Amino acid sequence: MTFEPQIPSWGNEYKNYLERLKSYHDWLCKTGINNGLISEKPLQYVWDEFIVHSLYFGKILQNIKNNDKNIYDLGTGGGIPGIPVALTNPNKLFTLVDISESRAFELQRLKNILNLENVEVFNESADAVLTDNNTYISRCFISSKDVLKNIKQLKNVTYIVSSNGENLNENKEKFHVKQEKFTINSTNIRHIDVINVK
């Protein structure tokens, strides 16, 4: 399989960041795999599922008011989706949160390699940073249904999370959920839920 680092038409504004995104991709495919941050995958899979998928989080963040504060990537693992979103949104602050000390160590090294001044790495459980008035993102860490359970006591929170597109049957008095559908390449569609606590 050949590797083509494409960006779908919905992400044309991200093409200026292609070289930095490819640097992160290279890091994931070497250091990320060698140190257990991600499992071994084909190069194209890593690009489509980890880089392009993450970029759609950034597209959603551009349209959310009150996201000028720090954005938390909970259960970030190898920096997914936080690193691609931070690379393409240099004026926003991101905190990558992971409970694994070894992952946090590697992410701190990556932050220095990529010279990411808008990124902090926090070695802690996700529960430790869930508070009112914040924006959170997660790709594989948690399901949308579990997000609804975990943030129901909070106020003024936005949580953007990968999903399978299922109906959440959320409490409409407490939550507003917008389900986004997008392509990561010419054929594959993915879903992200934007969950707001009222």
Describe the residue ranges of each PLM region.
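N-terminal cationic-hydrophobic initiation segments that often serve targeting/anchoring roles
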Residues: 62, 86, 151-152
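Conserved S-adenosyl-L-methionine
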Residues: 73-77
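Conserved SAM-binding loop of SAM-dependent methyltransferases across substrates and taxa
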Residues: 78-91
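S-adenosylmethionine
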Residues: 91-95, 99-198
